[in-house]
From Swiss-Prot:
SMART domains: EGF
Tissues where this protein is expressed: Expressed by the venom gland.
SUPFAM superfamilies registered for this protein in UniProt: EGF/Laminin
Any Gene Ontology CC annotation: extracellular region
Signal recorded as keyword: yes
Name this protein carries in UniProt: U18-myrmicitoxin-Mri1a
Organism listed in the record: Manica rubida (European giant red ant)
Cystine connections: C37-C52, C46-C65, C67-C76
Family: Belongs to the EGF domain peptide family.
Pfam family for this entry, one: EGF
Keywords: Disulfide bond, EGF-like domain, Glycoprotein, Secreted, Signal
Domain of life: Eukaryota
Main location: secreted
Amino acid sequence: MKNNYNRINTFIVYLMVTFSLISIISITECTPNHDPCPPQYAEALCLNGGTCFSVTIMGSDNYNCICAPGFRGWRCQEKDLDHPVNQ
């Protein structure tokens, strides 16, 4: 019986983490009014012409990048082969 409680508790924690991540992704992708990053982050965080923005989630500042066309990844560090830049 105790093993079943452990499985249920583990599943509940998994659901809580999953829904938290979904909320963060939704906020960062759908919120049109992002605050700009502080200069020390803006210069170092985003690569390949990406634009740094910050979103406050549950009292914590989170820094992300909006990538220039042709790039993707958390820091715009990867070439997006599905959308190459015309040269």
